[in-house]
Amino acid sequence: MLITRQELTRRHIRRSQYVSCDDAFIDVRLPGSMPKENYSIIGPGVTQNATQVINLREPHGFNIGAAGMAPGITNNLHLHFTAEVFIACEGTFTLRWGALGDEGEALLEEGDVVCMPPWMFRGFSNTGSRHGFLMTVLGGDDTGGIIWSPDVMRRARATGLWLGKDNQMIDVPAGSPAPPEDQLLPLMPPAEVSALRRWNPAELMARALKPAQRDFRIATLDAVLPGHGWQLAPVIGFGLSQHRDHRPAVSDPQGFSVEWLQVPPGQRSAAFTLDEAAVLVHAHGPLSVAFNDGNASVSTLMGAWDTLSIPAGTLRQFINTGSEPAHALLIVNGDARKRPQFDASVHAQAAALDMALDAGNHLARKSLLPPLMAV
């Protein structure tokens, strides 16, 4: 599949193109909850406002979004039906969980990534000194929406905001009667709230990865070639890594994998394809992504916290032409291990350096591998 310049421009969603909806949820009138920015970058996410701008509606198997808030602002307690991954881009946040936010809390700092379990009430506040910015990955093309804590729902209704059965907000002017009960999403019954699993801080933070914990390794066949010293560090699920000792922080299935990639100055990956749709969320450093081959080649330079949609089957290459390392997150659809497909010349060059893939698709010394068995 070829990517044209026009298509690449459409798929490279720059941070300056993200469009905030400042009243995406029913908690926007609660004290300490406004102003608050919600961004739907790839897919609608869980917005409850029909006017939310969505940069790219194409299904990827997951949604990419973001939230921005000033110091002291809170995103109130709610639960998801699929995974919610927080990527702390800028600022410092305090996570809280439980129906009243009293079951535990943890600090989320710049560069941290945490995978929040489904069916757990969670919220977060900007407890730093500057504007905070989080990016999110939500499992599934249809996330199913969210359930608000009953306490949040009651307080939101007192401000005139109700939630209809279509998961959209109903704004009732002061002094007007409440909407008919059969048109509203009901509050979660107390017995169901009590039945939810409780998570202690140690359990939750076992699902987080801090910058110092990133296990960067030479992890793909091409990375043994001169000038191709890029590295991977798994976060969630099983991604591109072909290193047999790599283990993600979160191994239970979420429907997607998340890995940090690091490209040192002057290094690159070889061009490769994947059978799955992917998204690159760029953190920092001079990173270009090139597509196609020969005269059809097109490329784009990523900016900080830009998002790039990479369709399945496209030939892509990560290149650092600068003087400092580049870091980005690669999110790929599916729970199974991914199999990056390199040109035969990459395999031949790696073999000359005594490196190959074993029968389990892991890196191994070619000199240790027996001849292929006839089938």
Stretches found by the model and what they are:
Residues 74-76, 94, 113-114, 118-124, ...:
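Histidine-centered metal-chelating micro-motifs
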Residues 1-60, 163-254, 361-375:
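A short, N-terminal "cap"/entry segment at the start of jelly-roll beta-barrel domains
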Residues 45-52, 63-80, 241-246, 257-275, ...:
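Conserved short histidine dyad/triad with adjacent acidic residue
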Residues 71, 81-99, 264-267, 274-293:
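Glycine- and acidic-residue-biased ligand/ion/polar-headgroup-sensing regions
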Residues 3, 10, 121-197, 317-375:
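Double-stranded beta-helix
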Residues 99-117, 293-312:
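Short acidic-glycine-tyrosine-enriched beta hairpin
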Residues 52-57, 74-80, 97, 105-107, ...:
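Short histidine-centered beta-strand/loop micro-motifs
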